[in-house]
């Protein structure tokens, strides 16, 4: 039986990415970049390595040596991985086996190059991993092998290169969106009072993989009154009146789309329906003002005013880039001061929160989806309605 590999990016896409990165390397006088394996946070901590190699998924460990002007070398764990990844992608021909001794394999490659200044990806600069994601012993072994070389943080170089998505990348994210929505449809087909959380979780993962999705991925969930958001699927059965809040990520060849699928077990109160209708309108209105060239704080102020005009209070303001992980731009609160502007090709998750001032539970009602920034506004990738769903009793 011939192997049918997952889709891969074109050589033209490789040249676009590598050109962006090498231009930034040259500006900072870096002779080489190195990145070590780290499959943490659903493999998002390995996003920069995947951007350079398009290798990864299903907990595959990948490292890379990325010279300014010579052949790029990727490192995987076993000879079998070398065989697989030499066939599964067309970007890198020099794929080497580490046998889990990553620094040793990378040192051997670095000895073949001439360099004095090395950029280390992952030392610092990640919003959700501010202390860095580089294994200390691996880096120390590399530094000891080259005592005369200078090693500096270079996380920002790949983060900046990743921020604006190409047409090929957006197509992969659209596929990830389809995968996420298919999993939601599958979940609601079997969801009813008495069905366990872990049964729903299993049905969603089954659907994702069957649709070409990749694991690990994030399913963030809470149910009950009040709910505690968690990542661990429990054997808790759904019960009448449970309010389900979630963040569901589909992943395709490493690229992520996130959606929300709020629900209530049983009839939905009219007041709740009205609140979610207001949340959907807020989402649409925000999409109309998130345009290429606008500053992030200006949109944040728009959000605050829109919420107040609707008779609610501002709440959580997650607006952050998505792609292979936590991509730029990231705006952690609506009134954060930054000079950043939206650019055409930014891909974002927007899920603006709003609080009913008369709601004693202080619940944060919101809808969310993945969008692409254009000159005229943010284009929503999803097709499912932005509503709260009633789950049968």
Which functions belong to the PLM regions below?
Residues 1-393:
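Active-site neighborhoods and metal-handling regions in enzymes and metal-associated proteins
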